[in-house]
Regions:
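Structural preference for solvent-exposed beta-strand-turn elements
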Residues: 1-180
Length: 180
């Protein structure tokens, strides 16, 4: 699995417990890896690599990604992800020559009210993963409410997040200092 390999290259400890069953421990993440040519190549071959940006932004104040490749099932926008991060206080940058996206924040992200222009499942998930560690309250209107997102929110709550509205298109997140 390319995403598991990518996480391992970032320094995440990975334990395979059985078929399709893994444990991940991300206590020593090498954020500098995000700026390497190896990451640009690896991340660019996987559409799902966008999903690491929100958690990295929340924990380390930065998240970078090459233009995602992978499957070719039509056009899927990234702007919902980045607009959500900007609403939380991040600054966006794009390096045209490398097709490399980045978001950065000084200090913690700040909770915000936001209306998503599309109910993107991955966009909502990425914003939720960033907002759980933001300072204050984040309210997401027009949030996706698919089962995948409900499972993610329930898992985050079991780790100490404070998310309400799970399963609806209005999600409220009270930011916490850390997850366990």
């Amino acid at each position: 699995n390319k995403l598991i390999t990518l996480l391992g290259n970032l320094g995440v400890k990975i334990q395979k417990n059985g078929p399709g069953d893994y444990t991940f421990q991300a206590d020593e993440v090498n954020v500098d890896y995000l700026k390497t040519e190896a990451f640009k190549k690896e991340g660019g071959s996987l559409r799902g690599s966008i999903m690491i940006v929100g958690p990295l932004l929340a924990r380390f104040g930065c998240g970078y990604i090459p233009k995602p490749g992978g499957d070719k099932i039509g056009r899927r926008r990234l702007d919902t992800h980045f607009e959500g991060f900007i609403n939380l206080g991040a600054k966006f940058r794009y390096e045209r020559e490398d097709h490399f996206y980045g978001v950065e924040v000084e200090g913690r992200l700040k909770g915000a009210y936001m209306l998503l222009d599309e109910a993107s499942v991955t966009g909502t998930a990425n914003i939720v993963m960033a907002a759980v560690l933001a300072e204050g309250i984040t309210t997401i209107y027009n949030a996706a409410c698919e089962p995948y997102l409900q499972q993610l929110c329930k898992m985050l709550n079991s780790m100490g997040a404070k998310i309400t509205g799970i399963g609806s298109n209005l999600i409220t997140i009270e930011g916490v200092e850390s997850l366990g």
